[in-house]
Amino acid sequence: MIKYLELKLVTAQHGSEISEAVQRVVDSGWYLQGTENKAFCEEFASFIGTAHCVGCGNGLDALTLILRAYKEMGIMEDGDEVIVPANTYIATILAITENNLKPVLVEPRIDTFQIDDTRIEEAITPRTRAIMIVHLYGKCAYTDRIGDICRRHNLRLIEDNAQAHGCKYGNRRTGSLGNAAAHSFYPGKNLGALGDGGAVTTNDTELAETIAALANYGSSRKYVFDYKGRNSRLDEVQAAVLRVKLRYLDADNSRRRNIALQYAERIQNKRLQLPSMEYCKQSVHHIFPVLCKQRDELQKYLLENGVQTQVHYPIPPHRQLCYKEMAEQKLPITEQIHAEELSIPLNQTLTQEEVETIIGLLNKF
């Protein structure tokens, strides 16, 4: 069986270094807010290309903390609007509504799966305060047009970079393109921890300091609480593991890209819509999305032939029960993607033999 993702193999790539890093933390006797967290945040900020990195508990917390900090800074208030792609994972929307802000859903492009920048400006109202782009599946969502819209309308640009660690737009990495970016280190991500973890990167010192306080119960000094905060911290074990894996991220992404280009070049089946070659060259391929009108049939066929797949995602946010107030929105492109998308295995641990098997099966379908 070719598993969709075998995390044990991902960890084993650098197993001895990871074990040494974990043991170093165990031996230190310091498990929160210590030297590993500080070092990782410095190293990750340098990698991304920002002045600041603040570790936190997970990617959802990172998004939520950014918006909460903007409210504490007086830049946003209850009822303000955040423009966001309609075809994202629900965490993106949860962060907005948890802050009593309104998500304004914008359709994606079918060829890139990213927010359609030609549809953004028509969604802006007097209450719009930010555009939140999502580098979905590992592909950069930023465009010069989006940057120009933010400047002309005085909007904050927030990046959800949970799925695109290491991706670039020109010479700049995602996570450094906007005012702030949220990162997830969920184990399955390109840069994954051995548990939950997250971070915010930004060049805004006031924002970074506010987020750091909010993530530490609202405290910037011990036992002094400036805000009604939360407990959301990146622990020392996860920070130590991430320091090891960060050193290999570019190489891992290069292997992912090599496999993706093989898929794009060699899968020749008119029943399948694959990402373009240009897409494949630009993405870090957290997910390799294939569109197929017979998606469920394709998934069953692959499983019967020993290949696991996943769907990202079967139900879009506006069709979820928790957001029934959005259910009447007309979002046909989003719904097409969610009805047809199938993610085939793509990660740096796949062998060439496994890649050949996947290509062969998809060509025979």
Model-derived regions, located:
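N-terminal "arm"/small-domain region of PLP-dependent enzymes with the aminotransferase-like
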Residues: M1-W30, N305, P345
